[in-house]
Amino acid sequence: MGKITFYEDRGFQGRCYECSSDCPNLQTYFSRCNSIRVDSGCWMLYERPNYQGYQYFLRRGDYPDYQQWMGFSDSIRSCRSIPYTSSHRIRLYERDDYRGLVSELMDDCSCIHDRFRLHEIYSMHVLEGCWVLYEMPNYRGRQYLLRPGDYRRYHDWGAMDAKVGSLRRVMDLY
């Protein structure tokens, strides 16, 4: 398992909370989060309790303020440790319910449009490993954690539309 430390103030100051497992509600430990240190593992942070709201993917490293993890505010209310796997495989479909097979990926894709000439993906099947989906190319914009399993519609991964810009494998390379 990984280890992550949340700090109420920027620059690793103020009250802190150390975490080494999934936590559906961080509100009892701190009221705001302005800096984070990830000592080990990869983590997905959520702006609301019970793994809801905006998602932020973090790897090992220091994040002295919330802009460093592309945060919109100092609200972090739940977190998940992402298990590491050595192999990754995902199937992308251009329509919902696994219709219109686009391709199978085993590596990162910085621009879905350049590779497949599509701006939208309506369903996915994650066969191996965990992935982070980004709504914009080059790993920017809203982020969504994809664990192994079925995603019949974009709502299943938490998105409000089918816009997909890039996909990245979750790998702790540091």
Swiss-Prot record:
Keywords: Eye lens protein, Repeat
Region (Connecting peptide), start-end ranges: 84-87
Domain of life: Eukaryota
Pfam families the UniProt entry points to: Crystall
GO-annotated molecular function: structural constituent of eye lens
UniProt domain Beta/gamma crystallin 'Greek key': residue ranges: 2-40, 41-83, 88-128, 129-171
GO biological process terms on file: eye development; lens development in camera-type eye
Disulphide connectivity of cysteines: none
Remarks, miscellaneous: There are six different gamma crystallins identified in mouse lens.
Family: Belongs to the beta/gamma-crystallin family.
Protein task: Crystallins are the dominant structural components of the vertebrate eye lens.
Protein's recorded name: Gamma-crystallin A
Organism from which the protein derives: Mus musculus (Mouse)
